[in-house]
From Swiss-Prot:
<dbReference type="Pfam" id="PF00651">
    <property type="entry name" value="BTB"/>
</dbReference>
<feature type="domain" description="BTB">
    <location>
        <begin position="28"/>
        <end position="98"/>
    </location>
</feature>
<dbReference type="GO" id="GO:0005856">
    <property type="term" value="C:cytoskeleton"/>
</dbReference>
<keyword id="KW-0206">Cytoskeleton</keyword>
<keyword id="KW-0217">Developmental protein</keyword>
<feature type="repeat" description="Kelch 6">
    <location>
        <begin position="526"/>
        <end position="580"/>
    </location>
</feature>
<protein>
    <recommendedName>
        <fullName>Calicin</fullName>
    </recommendedName>
</protein>
<dbReference type="InterPro" id="IPR048070">
    <property type="entry name" value="Calicin_BTB_POZ"/>
</dbReference>
<keyword id="KW-0597">Phosphoprotein</keyword>
<comment type="function">
    <text>Required for both nuclear and acrosomal shaping during spermiogenesis.</text>
</comment>
<feature type="repeat" description="Kelch 3">
    <location>
        <begin position="377"/>
        <end position="423"/>
    </location>
</feature>
<dbReference type="InterPro" id="IPR011705">
    <property type="entry name" value="BACK"/>
</dbReference>
<feature type="repeat" description="Kelch 4">
    <location>
        <begin position="425"/>
        <end position="475"/>
    </location>
</feature>
<keyword id="KW-0963">Cytoplasm</keyword>
<dbReference type="InterPro" id="IPR006652">
    <property type="entry name" value="Kelch_1"/>
</dbReference>
<dbReference type="GO" id="GO:0030154">
    <property type="term" value="P:cell differentiation"/>
</dbReference>
<dbReference type="InterPro" id="IPR015915">
    <property type="entry name" value="Kelch-typ_b-propeller"/>
</dbReference>
Length: 588
């Protein structure tokens, strides 16, 4: 009789004991020295995982009694990394982070271990973000990681307007010539306009003038001077004085300026590259007259006072929410004829004009508020049914591809007004909830820390309005809450609320702002509003219609301006500020 017995996890058991022997310096026959640190190991283990070690043993015709010594340059691999590599060789486990991924890639290259290289490659792909894509591109080029290189390049191209801005330029000025030239040559480069591309080129050259001046002539040809404003052309002309062999470039600039003097003034928009960005307000979904739900996606191009239809949503809904993050618009929730609180979530790619289905929200929501903070998408509060409010704040985790509970507000509310401060804090200001059996807007400010998942500051204040307020920051610690009946300035440092004499004028149709309107702050103290319900001129009839107009409020002077008429009158659409690529004008 014969019976076969197999030990469970025997391979792991053997390697664990070998690793213990290594750490106790038992039975070792090789040593790795890094900056006076000596690490002992077993030749047979390292030869099994590293072709480098196997090659050293075979090429030197080592006997079983010989000991192998390897000295590693500490400028290439640190002692801590070598220790981590040895743990990986013996256990097959490794913890990779943004801090150690570069040295682990060096270790994988040094010991010729392709599986570790694959792990590092996968980590870079899963963790790439706007703030690290420039560094990741450097790593990808250095270690020949094509997929990472393509993703990182796309991240830089799609966020060039950030990298070329004062906020991101400090790091971007170190961009290698081969990458910088490739970016300027890209027709889909996401610049604010061609002025930014030319200014970035000049700043990049002057950052290291002696070594980069030779690239200026080649890179200058990638700029469309006809799309650059006179002011920036004059600025560039003055900067050319400090560069050698600049006469040809100066002549080109002078030629463009002279042609403009002789021709009628025209918009520079038609000359911009396809990827140049247009500040736009995007309207999604909503309910039409007679109760029909809408799936249209419309964009109001602020600069041109022009409406365009971009796409159609994968579903029809009103009281949904939306937010933009880079080239994407995220939408979720809403109500339809059959369902009062949808869980569905989608992502719209403005560049490719395509939709991607996202995992459902944990619960169905209406009148929730979606917002982007630090490049991450959040959903704040909302209703799961009539008069049933939630305090949940959800975060969409791109790595896990799931909605996660980020934290909770101090009280359950829907219809909240939210403003971000930096890349960390959400200020959730007022919202609707049940007060003594009635739906009422409450005066509360929650400062939600997205890193800790906690409300780190909660301020309550009396309010005399039940409509939706407008928010803005004055200086660093003053939060302004503007409304028709009352405005409040909240000192976040002193935790004190003071009434303000300024107020928001009623809409030109004499209606107050409420949750049925699409409301969007567009910078420079200006607020965009469209849609929503309005009462009939004869108040005796108590009849309601949908507002067919769009308005722009200049808060500095307290006046409304009527804009181009939207394609459709919509009640409770979603609304967000987005940067659309110029190529959509060619696509329409």
């Amino acid at each position: 009789m014969k019976l076969e017995f197999t030990e469970k996890n025997y391979n792991s058991f053997v390697l664990q004991n070998l690793n213990k022997q290594r750490k106790r310096k038992e039975y070792w026959d090789m040593a790795l020295t890094v900056d006076h640190h000596v690490f002992f190991a077993h030749r047979n283990v390292l030869a099994a995982v590293s072709p480098l070690v196997k090659s050293l043993i075979s090429s030197n015709d080592m006997k079983t009694t010989d000991e192998l010594y390897i000295t590693i340059d500490p400028n290439y691999l640190s002692p801590a990394t070598v220790d981590q590599l040895l743990d990986y060789f013996y256990s097959g486990k490794v913890v990779i982070s943004e801090q150690n991924v570069e040295e682990l890639l060096r270790g994988a290259q040094y010991f010729n271990t392709p599986r570790l290289r694959i792990h590092c490659n996968d980590f870079l792909i899963k963790s790439i973000r706007r703030v690290n894509c420039l560094r990741y591109l450097f790593l990808a080029e250095l270690f020949e990681l094509k997929e990472v290189s393509d993703l990182a390049y796309s991240g830089i191209r799609d966020n060039f307007h950030f990298w070329a801005s004062p906020e991101g330029s400090m790091h971007f000025m170190r961009c290698p010539p081969v990458i910088f030239g490739r970016l300027l040559r890209d027709e889909n480069l996401h610049v604010l306009n061609e002025d930014q591309a030319l200014s970035a080129l000049i700043s990049w050259v002057y950052f290291r003038k002696e070594e980069r001046e030779k690239y200026f002539k080649k890179f200058f040809n990638y700029i469309n001077l006809n799309a650059v404003s006179n002011k920036t052309l004059m600025f560039a002309s003055n900067k050319l004085v400090g560069l050698e062999n600049n006469s040809a470039h100066a002549t080109l600039i002078e030629s463009v300026l002279m042609d403009r003097k002789q021709e009628r003034p025209c918009s520079l928009l038609s000359y911009q590259r396809k990827g140049a960005l247009l500040d736009s307000v995007v309207i999604l979904g909503g309910q039409k007259a007679h109760g029909k739900f809408n799936d249209g996606v419309f964009a109001y191009i602020i600069q041109e006072n022009l409406w365009l239809k971009l796409s159609e949503m994968p579903y029809r809904a009103a009281a949904l929410s939306a937010t933009a993050a880079g080239r994407y618009i995220y939408i979720s929730g809403g109500t339809t004829e059959q369902i009062s609180g949808l869980k569905t979530a989608w992502r719209y790619d403005m560049d490719d004009n395509s939709w991607t289905k996202l995992p459902d929200l944990p619960i169905g929501l209406v009148f929730h508020t979606m917002v982007t903070c630090g490049g991450t998408v959040y959903s704040v509060g909302g209703s799961i049914a009539p008069r049933r409010y939630v305090s949940n704040i959800y975060r969409y985790d791109e790595r896990k591809e799931a909605w996660c509970l980020a934290g909770k507000m101090s009280i359950p509310m829907d219809g909240t007004a939210v403003i971000t401060k930096g890349d960390r804090n959400l200020y959730i200001v007022t919202g609707r909830c049940l007060v003594k059996g009635y739906i009422s807007r409450v005066g509360v400010v929650d400062c939600f820390d997205t890193c800790t998942g906690e409300v780190v500051q909660c301020i309550t204040f009396p309010i005399e309005f039940n409509h939706r307020p407008l928010l803005s920051f004055h200086q660093d610690n003053i939060l302004r809450v503007h409304s028709h009946r009352q405005s409040v300035e909240i000192n976040l440092q002193k935790i004190k609320a003071n009434k303000s004499t300024t107020s928001v004028p009623l809409l030109p149709n004499s209606c107050p702002l409420d949750v049925s309107h699409a409301i969007c702050s567009i910078g420079d103290s200006k607020v965009f509003v469209c849609g929503g319900v309005t009462t009939a001129s004869d108040v005796q009839t108590k009849d309601y219609t949908i507002n067919p107009n769009a308005y722009l409020l200049d808060q500095k002077i307290g006046e409304w301006q009527t804009l181009a008429c939207p394609p459709e009158a919509l009640d409770c659409p979603a609304c967000c500020l987005a940067k659309l690529p110029c190529k959509i004008l060619q696509r329409i």
